[in-house]
């Protein structure tokens, strides 16, 4: 196996046993549910142990609230829609390793989707207010955009120098 690609839309739907197209239960669908986050972390950690790259496609890959978690988990590739590439690159570049690890430690101790989503939303709002822009916390290596695939690939880390 050369790589793992985590499809968060289906993973979340099947983990939560929720049809996101069914208005009676769609409100239960959330990638921020601790069960879904633990599965994502487990997949990425085990891919790393096996020497296999882990990528992610689906809405979560470009979600600003998910980015610190995915960086801390060690995600190698973010596959996002073309309209989200620039914003996702900027968001990735705004997180230091230390800060994303701290946020992830807090989140992984939480028990509910609401708790996780509120914490991440509040943290990111406060971070943006403190910095005024995303350029103050950078990673250490360049973020590369590969051709037209809209695949953001980590090469050792991120610093956003190619933005």
Regions inferred by a protein language model and the residue ranges of each:
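Generic detector of N-terminal low-structure segments
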Residues: 146-147, 153
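N-terminal polybasic/positive-inside topogenic patches
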Residues: 134-139, 150, 157, 162
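Non-catalytic helical/linker scaffolds that mediate oligomerization, partner binding
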Residues: 1-133
């Amino acid at each position: 196996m050369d790589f793992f690609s985590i499809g968060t839309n289906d993973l979340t739907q099947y983990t939560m046993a929720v049809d996101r197209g069914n208005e009676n239960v769609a409100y239960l669908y959330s990638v921020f549910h601790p069960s879904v986050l633990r599965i994502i972390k487990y997949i990425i950690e085990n891919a790393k142990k096996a020497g296999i790259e882990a990528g992610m496609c689906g809405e979560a890959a470009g979600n600003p609230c998910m980015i610190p978690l995915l960086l801390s988990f060690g995600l190698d590739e973010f596959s996002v829609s073309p309209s989200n590439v620039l914003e996702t690159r900027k968001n990735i570049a705004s997180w230091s390793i230390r800060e994303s690890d701290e946020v992830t430690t807090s989140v992984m101790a939480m028990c509910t989707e609401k708790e996780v989503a509120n914490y991440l939303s509040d943290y990111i709002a406060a971070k943006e207010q403190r910095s005024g822009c995303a350029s103050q916390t950078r990673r250490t290596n360049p973020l590369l955009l590969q051709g037209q695939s809209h695949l953001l690939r980590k090469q050792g880390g991120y610093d956003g120098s190619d933005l």
